[in-house]
């Protein structure tokens, strides 16, 4: 699972919309939408604010440890 997929998986688990993630992080909704469409990936400087908004650690976001139940990285 790539990082953007993991972000949306966690958002779904937390019933969080793209607009809510945008409000919590200050990241434009258009950028978040591009991640969903797999046009781009989140920039490294956004990862900590995404982790804070989703209440996860950077390790969880990058590796999926402790959060992925349906998907397994191979």
Report residues per predicted region.
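Recognition helix of helix-turn-helix/homeodomain-like DNA-binding domains
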Residues: 26-42
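DNA major-groove recognition helix of helix-turn-helix/homeodomain DNA-binding modules
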Residues: 45-60
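Residues in the helix-turn-helix
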Residues: 20, 31, 60
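Short, charged recognition helix plus adjacent turn
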Residues: 9, 52, 62-74
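Residues within the helices of the helix-turn-helix
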Residues: 8, 19, 48
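The alpha-helix within a helix-turn-helix
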Residues: 11, 22, 51
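A short, Lys/Arg-rich alpha-helix, primarily the initiator
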Residues: 1-16
